[in-house]
Curated annotation (Swiss-Prot):
This is Fe/S biogenesis protein NfuA. The keyword Magnesium does not apply. Binds 1 [4Fe-4S] cluster per subunit. The cluster is presumably bound at the interface of two monomers. Belongs to the NfuA family. [4Fe-4S] cluster binds at residues 151, 154. It comes from Xylella fastidiosa (strain 9a5c). Pfam families: NifU. One of its GO terms (biological process) is iron-sulfur cluster assembly.
Length: 199
């Protein structure tokens, strides 16, 4: 169930009335759900823009439409319109399930490594256009990775591996003893920092 405060309803109603489109409502959806970069998106929704499988929440003078694929991720979400200490007003959306749930310690070593790579490491690498994929996790706890995007061929990949990826995996995943790079960096087409420049 999604909770919407009366203040948020009044705020939405003011915005909808300003648009002056008959039947306009507000659509709520989850963007990149289940990942560290997950976010909630609110936008105006005219009747002609609706897909037809949205969940409807009657807010009195307008309808909040929830994208059907987002319902599970937005369950227990709270929407409020609050006044900050500075006097400014802000719309707040709290969606506790949108980023998914961290794997428990009973998850396998491979599952825990993959979860940390996908939800903590890759969002950081994405700022440089990079990414990393788990190729293998040995029974002894050695993780073999393959870098891609801006990390493929990057002159700073050794620093990224040791001070970023390996450090994070060893701190966050009990059982990881080492991290190795399986990437052929000589074939990188668009490195973030050229290996020649970094030398």
């Amino acid at each position: 169930m999604i909770q919407i405060s009366d203040r948020a309803k009044a705020h939405f109603l003011r915005l909808i009335q300003r648009e002056g489109v008959p039947g306009m409502g507000v659509r709520l959806s989850a963007v990149d759900p289940g990942t560290a970069r997950a976010d909630a998106r609110l936008e105006f929704a005219e009747p002609s823009e609706l897909v037809g499988d949205e969940w409807l929440i009657d807010c009195g003078d307008f309808t909040l439409y929830v994208a059907s694929a987002s319902v599970a991720w937005l369950d227990s979400a709270e929407i409020d319109y609050v006044t900050q200490a500075t006097g400014s007003q802000q719309l707040i959306i709290k969606a506790p399930k949108i980023k998914g749930q961290e794997l428990s310690q009973v998850a396998s070593l491979v599952e825990r490594v993959c979860w940390v790579v996908e939800n903590e490491i890759n969002p950081q690498l994405a700022s440089h256009g990079g990414r990393v994929e788990v190729q293998e996790v040995s029974a002894e706890g050695v993780v073999l990775l393959r870098f891609g995007g801006g990390c493929h061929g990057c002159g700073m990949v050794d620093v990224t591996l040791k001070q970023g990826v390996e450090k994070t995996l060893m701190e966050r995943v009990h059982g990881v003893i080492a991290v190795r790079d399986a990437t052929d960096h000589s074939t990188g087409a668009a490195p973030y920092i050229s290996r020649n420049f970094a030398s």
